[in-house]
């Protein structure tokens, strides 16, 4: 029986991870007494008793918890960090098992895994294969308009939307300094900072990450079919091995519902193209709380603990 402690269990991601783990027969979740949630010693005791600790905390708090684990005597638990604190750290494995052919094995052998950001998951999923295939240059001026459900904004945003205090649709992070940009660049190989423009809509969960392209501006002037083939080739092996990323044909009605994958760990990629205009848009669809957060965390937990 694998013992798991979720540090930050009461938050949006922590609650969903707990719900998913509750369905797994070979896992025991160690919970802290709510009255002792701020008690450092109580937290330390649970960390010492766990085989794996999941950090669902703000970045600074996650760094503090890692330091606490480092000071534990004896064998230390594995860690999955859902914050942004360690995503580009060389001593941590990036928790996107479908990223490359050897990534699932790296996660399986890791002691410390950094869970990807939700937007970053979608962006990396569509950019990395196209760059690896040579269809998209590393210095290409990438634009990533994206939209998420309001649960991605944390408790205060959730309360504002559900109380009717928030707009139906809102662009945000317009200072163009979103915290997911460093990991997008790090794990795709982009050398030019992408123009990432996120927005939030009046729906709880769901996400679309879009990559619009003028095909004639790319080397080799590829077709939409070329993009689809490169994406499909990149994910064929991981999909056959049980990975959660699928490359699918464009929808017949040329529409895409951001909420269709809610409460799953799936990520779907489609290429929509107008060959006459030489335009294409590559779109990743996922649940921002699923493959974008708690679902990915549980996928990594299963690999790390051999479940």
Predicted regions located by residue number:
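C-terminal substrate-binding/catalytic lobe of Rossmann-fold NAD(P)-dependent oxidoreductases
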Residues: 12-44, 56, 141-146, 150-282
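N-terminal Rossmann-like NAD(P) cofactor-binding subdomain of oxidoreductases
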Residues: 1-167, 172-174, 272-275
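Residue-level signal for short, function-critical loop segments
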Residues: 118, 217, 288
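Short amphipathic alpha-helical segments
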Residues: 122, 223-227, 293
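Helix N-cap/coil-helix junction residues
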Residues: 135-136, 190, 307
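PAPS/PAP-binding and catalytic site of the sulfotransferase fold
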Residues: 113, 227, 297
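NAD(P)-dependent Rossmann-like dehydrogenase/reductase catalytic/cofactor-binding core
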Residues: 266-268, 273-307
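Predominant activation on well-ordered alpha-helical scaffold segments within soluble catalytic domains
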Residues: 18, 63, 124-131, 181-185, ...
């Amino acid at each position: 029986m694998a013992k798991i402690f979720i540090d930050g269990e009461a938050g949006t991601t922590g609650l969903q991870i707990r719900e998913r783990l509750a369905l797994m027969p070979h896992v025991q979740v160690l919970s802290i007494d709510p009255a002792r949630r701020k008690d450092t010693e109580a937290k330390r005791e649970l960390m010492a008793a766990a085989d794996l600790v999941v950090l669902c905390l703000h970045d600074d708090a996650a760094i503090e918890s890692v330091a606490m684990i480092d000071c534990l005597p004896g064998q230390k638990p594995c860690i999955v960090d859902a914050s942004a604190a360690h995503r580009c750290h060389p001593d941590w494995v990036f928790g996107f098992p479908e990223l490359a052919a050897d990534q699932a094995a790296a996660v399986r052998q890791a002691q410390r895994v950094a869970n990807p950001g939700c937007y970053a998951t979608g962006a990396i999923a569509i950019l990395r294969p196209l760059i690896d295939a040579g269809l998209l240059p590393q210095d290409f001026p990438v634009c990533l308009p994206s939209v998420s459900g309001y649960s991605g904004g944390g408790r205060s945003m959730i309360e504002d939307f559900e109380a009717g205090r928030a707009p139906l649709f809102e662009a945000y992070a317009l200072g163009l300094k979103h915290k997911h940009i460093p990991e997008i660049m790090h794990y795709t190989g982009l050398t030019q900072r992408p123009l990432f423009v996120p927005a939030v809509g009046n729906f709880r969960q769901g996400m679309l990450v879009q990559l619009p392209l003028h095909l004639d501006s790319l080397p080799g002037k590829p077709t939409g079919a070329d993009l689809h083939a490169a994406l499909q080739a990149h994910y064929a092996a991981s999909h056959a091995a049980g990975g959660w990323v699928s490359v699918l044909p464009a929808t017949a009605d040329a529409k895409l519902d951001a909420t269709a994958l809610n409460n799953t760990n799936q990520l779907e990629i489609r290429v929509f193209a107008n060959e006459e205009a030489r335009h294409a848009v590559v779109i990743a669809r996922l649940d921002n709380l699923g493959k974008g957060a708690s679902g990915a965390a549980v996928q990594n937990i299963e690999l790390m603990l051999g479940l």
